[in-house]
Amino acid sequence: IDATSAITLEVNKFNRIIDSYSKTEKGTNMLNELKVDNSAIDISIKSILEYELNNDMIPENGIIITVTGSQLKYDALEKTEEFIEEQKIQVRFNNSGDEHKVSP
């Protein structure tokens, strides 16, 4: 997840986060507060975006969410996509090379 602080989430085949980290102090603090490890990817990304929105961590040009490795299933981020649309956040989603906009 690339915003003002880049976040890396490692996900298992059950779409649960097995590791999360950031190279920035702000990103690390956010992950420590949210405790996303061992949680569902959809809920975790939504929580991260909500935190970033509430803490002015979303750049004007929006956020990029990039998936490497196996693609996520089409409906894997249903709650996240609803939140993005409700909040009108600009998000580009690259699902292992298949890029599309999620935002309105």
Which residues does each predicted region cover?
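Polar, acidic low-complexity tracts enriched in Ser/Thr/Gln/Glu with frequent Gly/Pro and Thr-Pro motifs
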Residues: 1-104
